[in-house]
Amino acid sequence: MANIKQTIDELLTLDGAMCAAIVDTASGMTLGSGGSGLDLEIAAAGNTEVMRSKYKTMAALGLNDVIDDILITLGKQYHIIRPSKVKEGVFIYYVLDKARSNLALARRKAQDADANMKF
């Protein structure tokens, strides 16, 4: 099991990884972060709104399901938002350079990081 810092460090080992954060969904605050290329405090707050919106939409549609991850594909970056299966109310925010990363490996890395994270 890995603590938050170890989880961030592990996420950043993937080729093309730029930055990562563990975010509290209720407050939008980072519980831990690392890497560079973005202001992770602003990104955490903004992507908390993405999470809240998706949950609200799922409820309105009557979807009785869970979110594995949310992928936002930009021209030069991938942004992966993965709600934790280990700790309710927390998500992993993972940013990768699109030209240097493998999306399938990145999604798997986020899944494994979540499974091994302890609070």
Describe the role of every protein-language-model region.
Residues M1-F119:
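Non-catalytic interaction/Regulatory regions outside core domains
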